[in-house]
């Protein structure tokens, strides 16, 4: 299992994570064994947004023997009221719910204290001067949470968090279908029966979010990586074709700042399906050819950083160069952080010999040689 640095937290998290929301469906012992099995496969980061006692108890039992080997995303503001999940900022519920999380997880600290589920810009702005945020800061100051994170499905809100200076990582919904969707405060638009057929390529607000995370060294962990399983079924997929878990995971891992994918598991076989990413061939990871040939929703002409353009006669890392170009051109001037990352590349865009061999391999018809010229001009090398 490979690990990635989770932005400014400096935590080395496994590329495949554990999304715990399905644990309550199964007998307690079975779910505890599933956590143990995931750990044996090298998974070391787990998301617990669930407020129900059963899920929290299962996780507590599942991690108690090796708590120090796990990084826990624990959500602040996810509460259990009248036998139901209730998202709130009311401190009479927030504080006891978080204390309950610590108790049931049998721990005195949470690695990643998550500002839970903010999808409205107005709510994000209101939270900045609130008793709720004072509590989050108190938890950080006293070491009860080691780092501050935030979860959102709205790229505009997530971008504000990334630029806040105190949010160190973000749990965000990423997959090739959601990346086409415009920003919305309504999560239901992500799971509509039909996608707008006019949507093409990566939505600009999502691209801006990825750029902001890259610039501010804010790591991303991914939820909804499989779009609730829709992407596995060609009849339900907005592309009209099916993708595999490995292809979905690889798509997410080719987005800037992404460090880990929080997958939900019912069985050990599903853990194996996700962990298979670590030993998958380039052909097995190849989401690009599938999407490029899909009957719906085109990414034509847009680089998705899939790497199909390799190998390059001049040894350019074309996908990475394109990524830096896209991030840089979203601002009037090239950000210093993006420039410094680009300058660390061993081979620069100016070394492109214009053979266009890469273009014959690109499934999306990206004019790569032309983009190398533009990149060399933009960065001056």
Residue ranges: model-predicted function:
Residues 1-74, 108, 141:
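N-terminal binding-site loop/beta-alpha segment at the start of enzyme catalytic domains
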Residues 6, 18, 46, 59, ...:
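Conserved, mostly hydrophobic/aromatic
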Residues 19-29, 79-95, 233-242:
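Active-site mouth loops of central-metabolism enzymes
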Residues 23-29, 47-57, 80-81, 89, ...:
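Acidic-and-aromatic substrate-binding clefts and catalytic sites of carbohydrate-active enzymes
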Residues 26-38, 89-106, 152-160, 243-251:
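Short, acidic/polar
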Residues 100-123:
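Active-site groove signature of glycoside hydrolases
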Residues 118-320, 330-344, 370:
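Beta/alpha (TIM)-barrel catalytic core signal, keyed to glycine-rich beta->alpha loops juxtaposed to Asp/Glu
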Residues 303-312, 352-358, 362:
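Short cysteine clusters
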